[in-house]
Amino acid sequence: MNDIQLDQASVKKRPSGAYDATTRLAASWYVAMRSNELKDKPTELTLFGRPCVAWRGATGRAVVMDRHCSHLGANLADGRIKDGCIQCPFHHWRYDEQGQCVHIPGHNQAVRQLEPVPRGARQPTLVTAERYGYVWVWYGSPLPLHPLPEISAADVDNGDFMHLHFAFETTTAVLRIVENFYDAQHATPVHALPISAFELKLFDDWRQWPEVESLALAGAWFGAGIDFTVDRYFGPLGMLSRALGLNMSQMNLHFDGYPGGCVMTVALDGDVKYKLLQCVTPVSEGKNVMHMLISIKKVGGILRRATDFVLFGLQTRQAAGYDVKIWNGMKPDGGGAYSKYDKLVLKYRAFYRGWVDRVASER
């Protein structure tokens, strides 16, 4: 992230705002697509309700820009990559990684290139980054106001962890997705977690978790936790896990939230088992994609690792599907009768609204 310039002038404390739900987007980093889906051809996508095209430049850098050519509006996703630029399929105008038109071909051998290039021949681009197997785009201001979260366990080349990426489409608002981790009350009704008690925690001092320093200094860190007292392992693999000696009495969830998502660290009886990155692709109104990357600590031999992958990876993916089913029937900005157990959800909403207020414009 050192190559991404932050807009330091805009990073300052703002009023927290009301604890209401919002369908608006916070200024933050969002996922455009999986890295392995962007190869040597332009890819059509929609972000923030905006038609976009993604492609890789000469250096392999991911570029995301407006999809329709500034000339006559042709679809650049139907074009191709030529000399490190994206070439329009209609008149072969070429745009570089910054969105500037750098070449307009002539009409015959005598006139090989038209000059000068029209001043308005430019494609608006989004700030991009690439990490954790995702292409990210910044939303809300010309320059990023906070960095990507630092998660060494989630780096795809970290051989100490097993990684599982998955995604679900949903019709709910982004806030509903990113606040879900902080809702302790749904653990039993939705996920059948056999809990006898839970404790909600809020953290103001980031220094116990050095990886969040850059987020915290930008005012973009939301620290929280839930400690569940659990009777036994849950789900269809409970019997197998107990047979392997994987019993537990405490499930400790630590959350390093940021405006566009969350990093959850899961420990059982104090032993960290995996980290989960939750992030979102805002597609258009009424359509978003929740992404999750689970990084599971490698322990023991093949059987133990396979069990952990199923228990912490595949079962978590299945559990996420239960949440999505609920979300798809929710009113995105509904509700309002809160209990004391909604404390973390409401605190996160206030944090999130502060970053909604930092959005410079919708474009």
UniProtKB/Swiss-Prot annotation:
Cofactor: [2Fe-2S] cluster; Fe cation; FMN
Catalytic activity: aminopyrrolnitrin + NADPH + 2 O2 + H(+) = pyrrolnitrin + NADP(+) + 2 H2O
Site features described as Important for catalysis, chain residue numbers: D183, D323
Oligomeric form and interacting partners: Homodimer.
Name under which the protein is recorded: Aminopyrrolnitrin oxygenase PrnD
Principal EC category: oxidoreductase
Domain Rieske positions: 29-137
Pathway info: Antibiotic biosynthesis
Gene this protein is translated from: prnD
Organism whose genome encodes this protein: Pseudomonas fluorescens
Cited function: Involved in the biosynthesis of the antifungal antibiotic pyrrolnitrin (PRN). Catalyzes the oxidation of the amino group of aminopyrrolnitrin (APRN) to a nitro group to form PRN. It has high substrate specificity toward physiological substrate aminopyrrolnitrin, p-aminobenzylamine (pABA), p-aminobenzyl alcohol, and p-aminophenyl alanine.
A GO molecular-function annotation: oxidoreductase activity
Enzyme Commission no: 1.14.13.-
